[in-house]
């Protein structure tokens, strides 16, 4: 199959409404970001981000098409005119040229939905829910975001182990009460300090949300609210997974979906972009310390 045929198949089988807006050719994020789509496809590498290392691994696996969820050259729209003198850009471009690799971004079509258990489901967050093992606990399976779950009760320690294993993380940033009992979990929209953060704060309080798994998150609004709530003895916490880290599970799930869509005519493989963060532990100190609740209530 030609790469162009594969791209067409991916677009045609997906939903056409992304976050409430029709997918339009002039405005969609989903574009061929690099390479010649008229060549025969030798293999497809699925990844959240086509990093330099992902490109190298794709070449070693014999793949000449990378399907990525995020931009290739570090900016919305993947504009490259401003990067001509950038040495990292030049090296990444040379690597793509050396191996004849195409990069196609599949963002809007994946979020618009893939066929799953009947109706269309957001391809990223259905994949996240599936690989976390939380589909039976999803309170609104057809929602994009927020995703809300009522899982069997667990401790912070148990949740940490589950997240580190499923997402294959180097560590995870934690905010809140380390003694929290977790059952009601929410994956919210990005927490960016916008006025809408007040609605999320109200929802956490009103619906008794125990735990947030966050993507983008600034250090004020909801983050500071959760810290104060935990210090006041409430059963609240945040696992700050990170935008790219969290959505990576969705791309991992997409491998099996795309392979079925193409009737296994082309090999499809997942290459993990890897944890966006590394952690340098404080020697001789607790990595996560939390004052006793009664210090704040006395």
Q: What label would you give each PLM region?
A:
Residues 1-298:
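Active-site catalytic microenvironments in core metabolic enzymes, especially phosphate/sugar-handling
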């Amino acid at each position: 199959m030609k790469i162009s045929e594969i791209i067409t198949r991916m677009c045609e089988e997906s939903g056409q409404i992304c976050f409430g807006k029709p997918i339009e050719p002039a405005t969609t994020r989903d574009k061929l970001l690099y390479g010649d789509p008229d060549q025969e496809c030798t293999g497809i590498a699925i990844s959240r981000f086509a990093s330099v290392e992902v490109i190298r691994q794709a070449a070693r696996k014999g793949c000449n098409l990378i399907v990525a969820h995020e931009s290739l050259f570090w900016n919305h729209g993947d504009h490259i005119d401003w990067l001509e003198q950038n040495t990292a850009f030049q090296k990444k471009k040379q690597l793509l040229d050396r191996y004849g690799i195409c990069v196609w971004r599949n963002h809007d079509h994946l979020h618009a939905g893939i066929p799953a258990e009947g109706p269309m489901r957001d391809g990223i967050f259905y994949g996240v829910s599936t690989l976390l093992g939380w589909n039976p606990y999803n309170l609104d399976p057809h929602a994009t975001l927020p995703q809300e779950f009522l899982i069997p009760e667990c401790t912070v320690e148990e949740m940490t182990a589950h997240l580190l294993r499923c997402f294959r993380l180097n560590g995870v940033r934690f905010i809140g009460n380390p003694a929290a009992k977790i059952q009601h979990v929410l994956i919210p929209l990005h927490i960016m300090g916008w006025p809408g953060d007040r609605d999320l704060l109200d929802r956490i309080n009103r619906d008794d949300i125990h735990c947030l798994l966050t993507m983008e998150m600034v250090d004020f609004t909801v983050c500071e609210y959760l810290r104060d709530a935990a210090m006041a003895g409430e059963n609240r916490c945040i696992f700050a997974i990170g935008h790219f880290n969290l959505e990576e599970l969705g791309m991992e799930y997409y491998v099996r979906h795309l392979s079925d869509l193409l009737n296994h005519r082309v090999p499809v493989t997942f290459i993990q972009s890897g944890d966006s963060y590394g952690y340098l532990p404080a020697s001789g100190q607790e990595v996560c310390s939390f004052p006793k609740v009664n210090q704040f209530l006395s």
